[in-house]
Amino acid sequence: MLENRVKTKQIFIGGVAIGGGAPISTQSMTFSKTADIQSTKNQIDRLKLAGADLVRVAVSNEKDALALKELKKVSPLPLIADIHFHYKFALIAAQSVDAIRINPGNIGSKDKIKAVVDACKEKNIPIRIGVNAGSLEKQFDQKYGPTVKGMVESALYNAKLLEDLDFTNFKISLKASDVIRTIEAYRMLRPLVIYPFHLGVTEAGNLFSSSIKSAMALGGLLMEGIGDTMRISITGELENEIKVARAILRYSGRLKEGINLISCPTCGRIEANLVDMAGKVEKRLSHIKTPLDISVMGCVVNALGEAKHADMAIAFGNRSGLIIKEGKVIHKLAEKDLFETFVTEVENLAKEREKTLN
Protein backbone atom coordinates (compact mmCIF):
# COMPACT_ATOMS: atom_id res chain seq x y z
CA MET A 1 0.00 0.00 0.00
CA LEU A 2 1.34 3.42 -0.94
CA GLU A 3 1.30 5.69 2.10
CA ASN A 4 0.95 9.47 2.00
CA ARG A 5 4.31 11.20 2.14
CA VAL A 6 5.42 12.36 5.56
CA LYS A 7 5.22 16.17 5.75
CA THR A 8 8.64 17.61 6.55
CA LYS A 9 10.19 21.03 6.86
CA GLN A 10 11.11 22.44 3.45
CA ILE A 11 14.61 23.63 2.66
CA PHE A 12 16.17 24.79 -0.61
CA ILE A 13 19.41 23.74 -2.28
CA GLY A 14 19.82 26.38 -4.92
CA GLY A 15 16.44 26.48 -6.60
CA VAL A 16 15.56 22.87 -5.71
CA ALA A 17 13.03 22.42 -2.90
CA ILE A 18 13.69 19.52 -0.53
CA GLY A 19 10.87 18.30 1.72
CA GLY A 20 7.55 19.94 2.45
CA GLY A 21 5.82 17.93 -0.26
CA ALA A 22 8.27 18.91 -3.04
CA PRO A 23 9.08 16.26 -5.68
CA ILE A 24 11.72 13.79 -4.49
CA SER A 25 15.01 14.92 -6.01
CA THR A 26 17.88 12.76 -7.24
CA GLN A 27 21.57 13.40 -6.92
CA SER A 28 24.98 11.87 -7.49
CA MET A 29 28.59 12.64 -6.72
CA THR A 30 31.45 13.36 -9.10
CA PHE A 31 34.62 11.25 -8.85
CA SER A 32 37.07 13.69 -10.43
CA LYS A 33 39.44 15.82 -8.40
CA THR A 34 37.26 18.83 -7.71
CA ALA A 35 40.14 21.22 -8.34
CA ASP A 36 40.18 19.92 -11.93
CA ILE A 37 37.33 22.22 -12.87
CA GLN A 38 36.95 21.10 -16.48
CA SER A 39 36.82 17.38 -15.66
CA THR A 40 34.38 18.00 -12.83
CA LYS A 41 32.24 20.23 -15.04
CA ASN A 42 32.16 17.49 -17.69
CA GLN A 43 30.89 14.99 -15.14
CA ILE A 44 28.25 17.41 -13.85
CA ASP A 45 27.09 17.95 -17.44
CA ARG A 46 26.68 14.17 -17.80
CA LEU A 47 24.59 14.05 -14.64
CA LYS A 48 22.44 16.93 -15.80
CA LEU A 49 21.79 15.12 -19.08
CA ALA A 50 20.90 11.95 -17.16
CA GLY A 51 18.25 13.84 -15.19
CA ALA A 52 19.98 14.63 -11.89
CA ASP A 53 18.61 17.49 -9.80
CA LEU A 54 21.65 18.05 -7.58
CA VAL A 55 25.34 17.20 -7.51
CA ARG A 56 27.84 16.69 -4.70
CA VAL A 57 31.60 17.14 -4.99
CA ALA A 58 34.39 16.00 -2.68
CA VAL A 59 36.41 18.68 -0.90
CA SER A 60 39.55 16.85 0.17
CA ASN A 61 41.98 19.75 0.42
CA GLU A 62 42.22 23.52 0.28
CA LYS A 63 42.79 23.45 -3.48
CA ASP A 64 39.41 21.75 -3.93
CA ALA A 65 37.73 24.23 -1.60
CA LEU A 66 39.13 27.23 -3.44
CA ALA A 67 38.11 25.78 -6.83
CA LEU A 68 34.43 25.79 -5.84
CA LYS A 69 33.99 29.46 -6.66
CA GLU A 70 34.83 28.90 -10.33
CA LEU A 71 33.06 25.53 -10.46
CA LYS A 72 29.86 27.11 -9.18
CA LYS A 73 29.92 29.57 -12.08
CA VAL A 74 29.87 26.78 -14.67
CA SER A 75 27.81 24.10 -12.91
CA PRO A 76 24.36 23.50 -14.44
CA LEU A 77 23.23 21.88 -11.17
CA PRO A 78 23.08 23.14 -7.57
CA LEU A 79 26.39 22.31 -5.94
CA ILE A 80 26.86 20.50 -2.61
CA ALA A 81 30.29 20.41 -0.95
CA ASP A 82 31.12 17.12 0.80
CA ILE A 83 33.28 17.78 3.85
CA HIS A 84 35.11 15.27 6.06
CA PHE A 85 37.62 15.97 8.85
CA HIS A 86 38.58 19.55 7.92
CA TYR A 87 35.94 22.05 9.02
CA LYS A 88 37.94 24.96 7.58
CA PHE A 89 37.28 23.64 4.08
CA ALA A 90 33.57 23.98 4.85
CA LEU A 91 34.11 27.63 5.76
CA ILE A 92 35.70 28.26 2.37
CA ALA A 93 33.12 26.16 0.51
CA ALA A 94 30.18 27.95 2.12
CA GLN A 95 31.15 31.13 0.29
CA SER A 96 30.39 29.52 -3.08
CA VAL A 97 28.19 26.41 -2.94
CA ASP A 98 24.47 25.77 -2.46
CA ALA A 99 24.78 23.35 0.48
CA ILE A 100 27.30 21.69 2.78
CA ARG A 101 27.39 18.04 3.82
CA ILE A 102 29.21 17.29 7.07
CA ASN A 103 29.91 13.94 8.70
CA PRO A 104 29.40 14.42 12.45
CA GLY A 105 31.67 11.45 13.05
CA ASN A 106 34.76 13.29 11.86
CA ILE A 107 34.05 17.02 11.53
CA GLY A 108 35.28 17.79 15.04
CA SER A 109 34.24 19.65 18.17
CA LYS A 110 31.17 21.76 18.88
CA ASP A 111 33.20 24.90 18.23
CA LYS A 112 34.07 23.68 14.76
CA ILE A 113 30.46 22.79 14.02
CA LYS A 114 29.41 26.24 15.24
CA ALA A 115 31.87 27.83 12.83
CA VAL A 116 30.37 25.86 9.94
CA VAL A 117 26.83 26.78 11.02
CA ASP A 118 27.75 30.46 11.23
CA ALA A 119 29.21 30.35 7.70
CA CYS A 120 26.07 28.66 6.35
CA LYS A 121 23.81 31.11 8.18
CA GLU A 122 25.64 34.01 6.58
CA LYS A 123 25.05 32.60 3.09
CA ASN A 124 21.62 31.12 3.89
CA ILE A 125 22.57 27.65 2.67
CA PRO A 126 21.54 24.33 4.23
CA ILE A 127 23.60 21.61 5.87
CA ARG A 128 23.19 17.86 5.61
CA ILE A 129 23.89 15.98 8.81
CA GLY A 130 25.33 12.92 7.10
CA VAL A 131 25.45 10.10 9.65
CA ASN A 132 27.30 6.95 8.52
CA ALA A 133 27.22 3.68 10.47
CA GLY A 134 30.89 3.14 9.71
CA SER A 135 32.08 6.48 11.09
CA LEU A 136 29.99 7.32 14.15
CA GLU A 137 31.30 9.71 16.79
CA LYS A 138 33.34 7.98 19.48
CA GLN A 139 30.69 8.26 22.21
CA PHE A 140 28.01 6.61 20.08
CA ASP A 141 30.31 4.01 18.53
CA GLN A 142 31.60 2.89 21.93
CA LYS A 143 28.12 2.72 23.45
CA TYR A 144 26.13 1.24 20.56
CA GLY A 145 28.55 0.18 17.84
CA PRO A 146 27.59 0.64 14.15
CA THR A 147 23.93 -0.02 14.91
CA VAL A 148 20.57 1.54 14.13
CA LYS A 149 20.40 2.96 17.65
CA GLY A 150 23.87 4.46 17.30
CA MET A 151 22.98 6.18 14.02
CA VAL A 152 19.71 7.56 15.36
CA GLU A 153 21.29 8.83 18.58
CA SER A 154 24.02 10.56 16.56
CA ALA A 155 21.43 12.22 14.32
CA LEU A 156 19.34 13.41 17.28
CA TYR A 157 22.39 14.74 19.08
CA ASN A 158 23.56 16.71 16.07
CA ALA A 159 20.09 17.98 15.20
CA LYS A 160 19.77 19.31 18.75
CA LEU A 161 23.23 20.86 18.48
CA LEU A 162 22.22 22.78 15.34
CA GLU A 163 18.88 23.77 16.85
CA ASP A 164 20.68 25.14 19.91
CA LEU A 165 22.68 27.30 17.51
CA ASP A 166 19.36 28.62 16.15
CA PHE A 167 19.88 26.78 12.87
CA THR A 168 17.12 24.61 11.39
CA ASN A 169 18.07 24.81 7.71
CA PHE A 170 19.20 21.20 7.45
CA LYS A 171 18.37 17.68 6.32
CA ILE A 172 19.48 14.34 7.71
CA SER A 173 20.82 11.09 6.28
CA LEU A 174 21.36 7.77 8.08
CA LYS A 175 23.45 5.55 5.87
CA ALA A 176 24.52 1.96 6.34
CA SER A 177 25.82 -0.52 3.79
CA ASP A 178 22.96 -2.99 4.21
CA VAL A 179 19.22 -2.95 3.67
CA ILE A 180 17.97 -3.81 7.16
CA ARG A 181 19.87 -1.16 9.13
CA THR A 182 19.06 1.46 6.52
CA ILE A 183 15.31 0.84 6.70
CA GLU A 184 15.20 0.53 10.49
CA ALA A 185 17.24 3.68 11.10
CA TYR A 186 15.08 5.91 8.92
CA ARG A 187 11.91 4.38 10.37
CA MET A 188 13.09 4.95 13.93
CA LEU A 189 14.11 8.57 13.38
CA ARG A 190 11.20 9.69 11.19
CA PRO A 191 8.62 10.36 13.97
CA LEU A 192 11.22 12.12 16.12
CA VAL A 193 12.18 15.02 13.81
CA ILE A 194 10.54 17.32 11.26
CA TYR A 195 13.56 17.66 8.99
CA PRO A 196 13.77 16.28 5.43
CA PHE A 197 15.55 13.00 4.85
CA HIS A 198 18.25 12.25 2.30
CA LEU A 199 17.96 8.53 1.51
CA GLY A 200 20.75 6.19 0.49
CA VAL A 201 22.49 2.88 1.07
CA THR A 202 26.18 3.69 1.35
CA GLU A 203 28.96 1.64 -0.25
CA ALA A 204 26.28 -0.47 -1.92
CA GLY A 205 28.57 -2.10 -4.49
CA ASN A 206 28.44 -2.48 -8.26
CA LEU A 207 25.45 -1.85 -10.52
CA PHE A 208 23.72 -5.16 -9.83
CA SER A 209 24.13 -5.35 -6.05
CA SER A 210 23.51 -1.64 -5.50
CA SER A 211 20.36 -1.69 -7.61
CA ILE A 212 18.95 -4.58 -5.56
CA LYS A 213 19.94 -3.15 -2.17
CA SER A 214 18.72 0.33 -3.05
CA ALA A 215 15.44 -0.86 -4.53
CA MET A 216 14.70 -2.89 -1.41
CA ALA A 217 15.69 -0.24 1.14
CA LEU A 218 14.74 3.00 -0.59
CA GLY A 219 11.77 1.61 -2.47
CA GLY A 220 10.28 0.35 0.78
CA LEU A 221 10.86 3.65 2.57
CA LEU A 222 9.45 5.66 -0.32
CA MET A 223 6.29 3.57 -0.34
CA GLU A 224 5.93 4.29 3.38
CA GLY A 225 6.09 8.01 2.61
CA ILE A 226 9.63 8.45 3.93
CA GLY A 227 12.24 10.36 1.92
CA ASP A 228 12.74 13.75 0.30
CA THR A 229 15.92 13.38 -1.77
CA MET A 230 18.06 10.36 -2.67
CA ARG A 231 21.34 9.09 -4.02
CA ILE A 232 22.02 5.59 -5.31
CA SER A 233 25.62 4.66 -4.49
CA ILE A 234 27.10 2.59 -7.33
CA THR A 235 30.67 1.56 -8.05
CA GLY A 236 30.45 2.44 -11.73
CA GLU A 237 29.20 5.01 -14.19
CA LEU A 238 27.63 8.22 -12.89
CA GLU A 239 24.60 8.03 -15.15
CA ASN A 240 23.58 4.67 -13.71
CA GLU A 241 23.02 6.25 -10.30
CA ILE A 242 20.42 8.59 -11.74
CA LYS A 243 18.88 5.94 -14.00
CA VAL A 244 18.37 3.57 -11.06
CA ALA A 245 17.15 6.36 -8.76
CA ARG A 246 14.49 7.48 -11.19
CA ALA A 247 13.43 3.88 -11.82
CA ILE A 248 12.98 3.32 -8.08
CA LEU A 249 10.92 6.49 -7.86
CA ARG A 250 8.73 5.34 -10.75
CA TYR A 251 8.20 1.80 -9.50
CA SER A 252 7.49 2.96 -5.93
CA GLY A 253 4.77 5.25 -7.25
CA ARG A 254 6.56 8.51 -6.46
CA LEU A 255 7.32 9.61 -10.02
CA LYS A 256 4.92 9.49 -12.93
CA GLU A 257 7.31 9.48 -15.87
CA GLY A 258 8.46 7.39 -18.78
CA ILE A 259 7.88 3.88 -20.06
CA ASN A 260 6.85 1.05 -17.77
CA LEU A 261 7.86 -2.03 -19.77
CA ILE A 262 5.86 -5.20 -19.18
CA SER A 263 7.41 -8.27 -20.82
CA CYS A 264 7.20 -11.98 -20.06
CA PRO A 265 10.18 -14.00 -18.76
CA THR A 266 9.99 -16.33 -21.81
CA CYS A 267 9.16 -20.03 -21.93
CA GLY A 268 8.75 -22.78 -24.52
CA ARG A 269 5.62 -21.15 -25.90
CA ILE A 270 7.22 -17.95 -27.19
CA GLU A 271 7.07 -17.48 -30.94
CA ALA A 272 9.56 -14.65 -31.41
CA ASN A 273 12.95 -13.39 -30.27
CA LEU A 274 11.38 -11.69 -27.28
CA VAL A 275 14.60 -10.86 -25.45
CA ASP A 276 15.86 -8.91 -28.45
CA MET A 277 12.52 -7.19 -29.03
CA ALA A 278 12.04 -6.13 -25.40
CA GLY A 279 15.56 -4.71 -25.26
CA LYS A 280 15.12 -2.79 -28.51
CA VAL A 281 11.77 -1.38 -27.41
CA GLU A 282 13.11 -0.22 -24.05
CA LYS A 283 16.15 1.43 -25.63
CA ARG A 284 14.28 3.17 -28.47
CA LEU A 285 11.56 4.51 -26.17
CA SER A 286 13.84 5.64 -23.33
CA HIS A 287 13.49 9.29 -24.42
CA ILE A 288 9.75 9.34 -23.73
CA LYS A 289 8.80 11.16 -20.52
CA THR A 290 5.05 10.62 -20.79
CA PRO A 291 4.00 7.85 -18.37
CA LEU A 292 2.93 4.86 -20.48
CA ASP A 293 2.50 1.14 -19.77
CA ILE A 294 3.99 -0.83 -22.67
CA SER A 295 3.52 -4.59 -22.99
CA VAL A 296 5.72 -6.88 -25.11
CA MET A 297 4.54 -10.49 -24.81
CA GLY A 298 5.81 -13.60 -26.55
CA CYS A 299 2.62 -15.64 -26.94
CA VAL A 300 -1.15 -15.39 -26.59
CA VAL A 301 -1.42 -16.91 -23.08
CA ASN A 302 -1.08 -13.61 -21.20
CA ALA A 303 -0.58 -11.20 -24.08
CA LEU A 304 -4.18 -10.24 -24.67
CA GLY A 305 -4.92 -9.95 -20.96
CA GLU A 306 -1.95 -7.66 -20.40
CA ALA A 307 -2.85 -5.67 -23.51
CA LYS A 308 -6.25 -4.78 -22.05
CA HIS A 309 -4.51 -2.89 -19.25
CA ALA A 310 -1.54 -1.51 -21.23
CA ASP A 311 -1.47 1.71 -23.21
CA MET A 312 0.24 -0.07 -26.11
CA ALA A 313 1.13 -3.72 -26.59
CA ILE A 314 2.68 -6.28 -28.91
CA ALA A 315 1.25 -9.81 -28.85
CA PHE A 316 3.41 -12.23 -30.85
CA GLY A 317 2.01 -15.13 -32.86
CA ASN A 318 3.55 -17.45 -35.43
CA ARG A 319 6.06 -15.22 -37.29
CA SER A 320 3.63 -12.34 -36.89
CA GLY A 321 2.09 -10.20 -34.19
CA LEU A 322 -0.63 -7.81 -33.14
CA ILE A 323 -0.17 -4.19 -32.11
CA ILE A 324 -2.82 -3.27 -29.58
CA LYS A 325 -3.58 0.31 -28.55
CA GLU A 326 -5.63 0.92 -25.41
CA GLY A 327 -7.13 -2.56 -25.66
CA LYS A 328 -7.95 -2.47 -29.39
CA VAL A 329 -6.05 -4.23 -32.18
CA ILE A 330 -4.79 -1.62 -34.64
CA HIS A 331 -2.27 -3.68 -36.68
CA LYS A 332 -1.57 -7.30 -37.58
CA LEU A 333 1.89 -7.46 -39.15
CA ALA A 334 4.71 -9.79 -40.07
CA GLU A 335 7.32 -10.02 -37.33
CA LYS A 336 9.88 -8.07 -39.38
CA ASP A 337 7.54 -5.08 -39.63
CA LEU A 338 6.42 -4.95 -36.01
CA PHE A 339 9.22 -3.04 -34.32
CA GLU A 340 9.32 0.21 -36.31
CA THR A 341 5.54 0.41 -36.53
CA PHE A 342 5.22 -0.20 -32.80
CA VAL A 343 7.77 2.50 -31.94
CA THR A 344 5.97 5.00 -34.18
CA GLU A 345 2.61 4.20 -32.59
CA VAL A 346 3.99 4.59 -29.06
CA GLU A 347 5.62 7.92 -29.92
CA ASN A 348 2.36 9.16 -31.44
CA LEU A 349 0.42 8.06 -28.37
CA ALA A 350 2.89 9.89 -26.12
CA LYS A 351 2.33 13.07 -28.13
CA GLU A 352 -1.44 12.63 -27.87
CA ARG A 353 -1.22 12.22 -24.10
CA GLU A 354 1.06 15.25 -23.76
CA LYS A 355 -1.47 17.41 -25.61
CA THR A 356 -4.18 16.20 -23.24
CA LEU A 357 -2.04 16.90 -20.17
CA ASN A 358 -1.15 20.38 -21.39
Swiss-Prot record:
GO MF assignments: 4 iron, 4 sulfur cluster binding; 4-hydroxy-3-methylbut-2-en-1-yl diphosphate synthase activity (ferredoxin); 4-hydroxy-3-methylbut-2-enyl-diphosphate synthase activity (flavodoxin); iron ion binding
Binding-site residues for [4Fe-4S] cluster, renumbered to this chain: 264, 267, 299, 306
Pathway: Isoprenoid biosynthesis; isopentenyl diphosphate biosynthesis via DXP pathway; isopentenyl diphosphate from 1-deoxy-D-xylulose 5-phosphate: step 5/6
Entry-linked InterPro entries: Dihydropteroate_synth-like_sf, Enolase-like_C_sf, IspG_bac, IspG_bac-typ, NO2/SO3_Rdtase_4Fe4S_sf
A GO biological process held by the record: terpenoid biosynthetic process
Cofactor binding note: Binds 1 [4Fe-4S] cluster.
UniProt-listed SUPFAM superfamilies: Enolase C-terminal domain-like (SSF51604), Nitrite and sulphite reductase 4Fe-4S domain-like (SSF56014)
Entry EC no(s): 1.17.7.3
Family, per entry: Belongs to the IspG family.
Protein function: Converts 2C-methyl-D-erythritol 2,4-cyclodiphosphate (ME-2,4cPP) into 1-hydroxy-2-methyl-2-(E)-butenyl 4-diphosphate.
HAMAP family linked to this entry: IspG
Name by which UniProt lists this protein: 4-hydroxy-3-methylbut-2-en-1-yl diphosphate synthase (flavodoxin)
UniProt organism field: Helicobacter acinonychis (strain Sheeba)
Underlying gene: ispG
